[in-house]
Amino acid sequence: MRKITFILLVIPIIVFPQRKKDRDTSAVILQPNRIEFEKNRDASEFYVVPGGADGILIVEETLEAGSFGGYEWKLHMVDTALQVVWSSTMILPSDGYIIGYEYFEGRFYLLFNKDRYRSEDLIVYQFDRDRPDFRTYEITTVFPIDITHFESVGETLLIAGYANFRPVVITYNINDRIPRVVPGFYDNKNDILDIVVDEHSQLFTVILQERMKNKKYTVRVKTFTSKGDIIQDNLVNPGEKKSLLDAASTTFAGGLQYLAGTHSRKSLQYSQGFYLSKFINGQQQFNKFYAFAELNNFFGHMKPKREERIMNRIEKKRARGKTKKFNYRLLVHKILERDGEYIMIAEAYYPRYNYSATGSNFSSFGGYAPGTGRGNPYFLGYKYTHAVVLAFDPNCNILWDQTFKIEDIQTYSLEENVVVSGSGDRVILMYLEENEIRSKVVERNEIVEGRTFSPVKLSHENDELKTRDPGVEGIKKWYDETLFAYGEQNIKNPSGVAGKTTRKVFYINKIQYDLDKQPN
């Protein structure tokens, strides 16, 4: 194995903002630490695996040839101060590629395909925080799987996806090293929406969308032990007229489980509101449905005059005893539990298309406008408009709701962009775009600090950002009230850093916040 050679710049606590035109910056966001990894080749790709208070594992895919074939992958373990704990190199076959990664109770897992032409041959590498040694687990699923989920719970790895277009869930115990298919999933009627792991009870919940006999759709939630033994199977009854499009679930705690998602009467692409469900020991207690028009701030991301016009239409409809209907595509996040409340997050988006003959052909209200263009449609990506945050109590009554405008983000696959965190009664919403941490602080239905734009801080006083890769940047939760931003940047410094006036780096900035501070 060839010794790894790279330049690692560990940045001190004092970091400096980039030069940019004046915009409102947040008074509550702090960026105390930063680390940079210099990119020697454009082909390098970085993956970050947050491990709570154990730090972050940074994985770099390179095109550097290994001593006995294959390519080098560089790994760096950093602690919560973004100081390097260890660095290492491993060689992967040239046909192998990374599928997913996971962290659970001090262990970091990387899931790879050994051969891109044989999806049933997998390999998992397990790393610990304190040393670069790793364990290897070779897994053969017998049949090819299109993997969509990779999780870990206790001594068990969870692999889920589709085999022959049907859902399948596999458990793999790292002690006996035997893969087992979890029964009850290989059915054409179901689609896997998500998998939720409870670290404390070491249970996992699989959320499925299921087609009913009346051709409507509902949600089924199955909870298992880490061995794959089922302990609860909940099927939501949405009534005769509604379809449930998606769902997020709380962890299974003492027989109590909540579900939240979106619903519609006809379309499977557009939702008309939210639903909240409560289960106790497998018995559905109730469903509560809320139209978008019933929320206080759902349209708060719009310009004031437009919001006022929409609210007037809602009130006119309400005066006649009816509810105004709105259609949105929403990407639902996981449910957060804090201080006796349950917080649901969703991001509104719409697909954008271009036409070879007539150009753009899309609707800013959330969808493609048919019949207005010519030629073959060319998919440009998903455009995000705003995030919705709502809190509900144990009886599924909505306590408050807020919105957060999203600008400039477009992705080719649906991705969660907005991160929600908080302390006390205050909640902060953040996303990273164009090298800015865009944020908003709310306290229930009140806005504490409006939208702000805090530049990602650079390492040296004379640093100047030249370009950044829009496809490689984001914010992730880390531990407690700490997050981190990451991305790729081209930086210029006339004074020079390590003998260079320009450098291309992959960076991680530690982000903390003080919500007790008064806004600017």
Where are these regions (language model features)?
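Repeated scaffold domains used in trafficking and secretory/extracellular systems
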Residues: 40-48, 93-103, 139-153, 188-198, ...
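Loop/turn-rich, solvent-exposed surfaces of beta-rich toroidal or solenoidal domains
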Residues: 331-358, 369-391, 412-449
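Blade-loop segments of beta-propeller domains
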Residues: 81-120, 134-147, 233-241, 404-408
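Short beta-strand elements that form the blades of beta-propeller/WD-repeat-like
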Residues: 47-48, 53-68, 104-117, 148-149, ...
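Beta-propeller blade signature
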Residues: 72-80, 122-130, 171-174, 217-230, ...
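A short helix->beta-strand "capping" segment at the edge of beta-propeller domains
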Residues: 19-43, 80-86, 312-325
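Bacterial Sec-dependent N-terminal signal peptides
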Residues: 1-26, 520
